Amino acid sequence: MFRLTSVGCILLVIAFLNLVGLTNACTSEGYSCSSDSNCCKNVCCWNVCESHCRHPGKRTRLQGFFKHRR
């Protein structure tokens, strides 16, 4: 009787820990986010989880400027 109860308690604890782990899951790279704390790597750039924020260089901004002028 004691073994059955202790095994049941252990399984209940494992199930509870899995439930807590699922509710605090972080967002993977490439998925949408609202803040840095939502992302696994804690970098939310332009509402998307990234490994690091990329800031476009002068050439990229200039090309974008000319595309919008047409």
UniProtKB/Swiss-Prot annotation:
What protein name does the entry list? Conotoxin Im11.11
Q: What does this protein do?
A: Probable neurotoxin.
Single GO molecular function: toxin activity
Subcellular localization: Secreted
**Keywords, comma-separated and alphabetical:** Amidation, Cleavage on pair of basic residues, Disulfide bond, Neurotoxin, Secreted, Signal, Toxin
Q: Which residues form the propeptide?
A: 60-70
Task: Give the residue range of the signal peptide.
Answer: 1-25
Might you report a single GO cellular component term?
A: extracellular region
* Domain of life where this protein originates: Eukaryota
* Disulfide bonds listed in the record: 26-40, 33-45, 39-49, 44-53
Its domain comment says: The cysteine framework is XI (C-C-CC-CC-C-C).
Q: Any other noteworthy remark?
A: The mature protein is identical to the Conus litteratus toxin AC C7DQX6.
This chain's source organism reads: Conus imperialis
The family note in this entry says: Belongs to the conotoxin I2 superfamily.
| Tissue specificity remark | Expressed by the venom duct.
- One Pfam family in the UniProt entry: Conotoxin_I2
What InterPro entries does the entry give? Conotoxin-I_CS, Conotoxin_I2
Could you tell me which residues carry Proline amide?
56
